[in-house]
Curated annotation (Swiss-Prot):
Belongs to the glutamyl-tRNA reductase family. Keywords: NADP, Oxidoreductase, Porphyrin biosynthesis. This is Glutamyl-tRNA reductase. Possesses an unusual extended V-shaped dimeric structure with each monomer consisting of three distinct domains arranged along a curved 'spinal' alpha-helix. The N-terminal catalytic domain specifically recognizes the glutamate moiety of the substrate. The second domain is the NADPH-binding domain, and the third C-terminal domain is responsible for dimerization. It is an enzyme of class 1 (oxidoreductase). Substrate binds at residues 49-52, 109, 114-116, 120. It holds the Pfam family GlutR_N. It catalyses: (S)-4-amino-5-oxopentanoate + tRNA(Glu) + NADP(+) = L-glutamyl-tRNA(Glu) + NADPH + H(+). One of its GO terms (molecular function) is glutamyl-tRNA reductase activity. NCBIfam families: hemA.
Length: 448
């Protein structure tokens, strides 16, 4: 069995392509089932977000499995197989494990160290598990990856430093006010950066937010989407008299907030602080306003300095997390190597205990007068003899797990003790056959 990961992400495909290869939430369960029923696939998890669509699979053969996954994606999104090959990257074995660990911990995200992907991986795994497309390997591996990512974030604080301009804008406001929950905010503009700033303000606890824009319809649309207030741009001077935070991001060719405007409203504001954050280029807010008492004016260069410093902190944290990944891969490989040994040890124990049970039956027939206490003593000691006899063979079997010729030697081990253990590959195939029948039955029932 082999682990393979096929990924379409922000490095391999531009946004125009990624938009075309995203599974809708309501289609993911069926997609899991369709892929699972495909030849060569023994286990699978599908991850689909705005920045990546990935298939993780346990396959019986690498080349066959890779082809059928690529064909599945091509059919799902209306592409040719060669198109999918061109827009994706393929990881196999240890590289696939490393990829999963990096994705889950946010090291492979557009925003380094972001935590949203951890929840998305967890949801994808839980969906696959509930659908029935995971088995022994993925049930262990994905739990390991999720645990690793949680620990990495807790130990390094990689997600604690803002690395987007809109998020950094809110962080600057926090430096002035501390908690923002009771503050009033104005968003000038209704584009993408304005919406991101609005979302970050909402995330900080602020609820009193007003969107203003030259085109009132756009302000109305953005405000309705996030359930905040809106107003005309001409109302800005009046709004500034009671505002605490202003974030401006428009494409205006002249200043929207001028020195004269701020000087006029400053008289009515008494000594209340006002934070003006200009993330527009060209600038929306006239330079020099910071000279007015209790007025804090920041532009994109101020934000860039904060973002750059925070990014360096995240990169240091990412390096620390990356150093831990080889240990996780080794732990996974150790666990995998034991999969072939466990059934052999189980078969050996079962045979030994069957011999002990036969021996006790023989003793019962030949010594029918034994008391229950005497019988328990004999049973206990015969089991003890068996455990002592099995101690060294079991130890040897475990050591075979790390041997390059473990399969051959485990087969010899079984021949010596005249036992027969089912290999993990056969178990996985039988498990798949059973689950495919369940999926088919579920679909028939759903159709009826």
């Amino acid at each position: 069995m082999h682990f393979i990961a096929i990924s379409i992400n922000h490095r391999t495909a531009d946004v125009a392509l990624r938009e075309q290869v995203t599974f809708r939430d309501d289609a993911l369960r069926i997609a899991h089932e369709d892929l699972y029923e495909t030849k060569s696939i023994l286990e699978n998890v599908i991850l689909s977000t705005c920045n990546r669509t990935e298939v993780y699979a346990v396959v019986d053969q690498i080349h066959t499995g890779r082809y059928y996954i690529q064909r599945f994606l091509a059919r799902a999104f209306g592409f040719e197989v060669d198109d999918i090959k061109a827009m994706s990257e393929v990881k196999v074995g240890d590289e696939a494990v490393e990829h999963l660990l990096r994705v889950t911990s946010g090291l492979d995200s557009i925003v380094l160290g972001e935590t949203q992907i951890l929840g998305q991986i967890r949801d994808a795994f839980f969906l696959a598990q509930s659908t029935g497309t995971t088995g022994t390997i993925f049930n262990h591996l994905f739990k390991q990856a999720i645990t690793f990512a949680k620990r990495a974030h807790n130990e390094t604080d990689i997600a604690d430093n803002a690395v987007s301009v809109s998020y950094a804008a809110v962080e600057l406001a926090k430096k002035v006010f501390g908690k923002l929950k009771s503050k009033q905010a104005i968003i000038i503009g209704a584009g993408e950066m304005s919406e991101l700033s609005l979302l970050n303000l909402l995330g900080s606890g602020i609820t009193d937010i007003t969107v203003v824009n030259r085109t009132i319809e756009n302000a109305m649309k953005l405000a309705a989407k996030h359930q905040v207030k809106y107003d005309e741009l001409s109302s800005l001077p009046n709004l500034l008299e009671s505002a605490d935070i202003v974030i401006s991001s428009t494409s205006a060719q002249s200043y929207i907030i001028t020195n004269e405007m701020i000087e006029r409203i400053a008289e009515n504001r008494k000594q209340d602080s006002l934070v003006l954050i200009d993330i527009a280029v060209p600038r929306d807010i006239e330079p020099g306003i910071s000279a007015i008492t209790n007025i804090f004016n920041y532009d994109v260069d101020d934000l860039k300095g904060l973002v750059d410093a925070n990014l360096r902190e995240r990169q240091l944290a990412a390096a620390t997390i990356s150093e831990q990944i080889p240990t996780e891969i080794h732990a996974h490989n150790e666990w995998i190597s034991m999969l072939g040994v466990v059934p052999v040890i189980r078969a050996l124990r079962e045979k030994a205990m069957a011999i002990q049970a036969e021996t006790m039956d023989s003793i019962d027939r030949k010594l029918p007068g034994l008391s229950e206490r005497e019988r328990k003593i004999i049973s206990k000691h015969t089991k003890s003899i068996i455990n002592q006899m099995l101690k060294d063979p079991i130890k040897q079997a475990k050591e075979l797990s790390s041997d390059k010729k473990s399969n051959e030697k485990l087969e010899l081990f079984q021949n010596i003790f005249d036992i027969e253990a089912e290999c993990p590959h056969e178990q996985a195939k039988q498990q798949k056959e059973s689950k495919v029948k369940e999926i088919s039955a579920r679909r028939i029932f759903s159709f009826e």
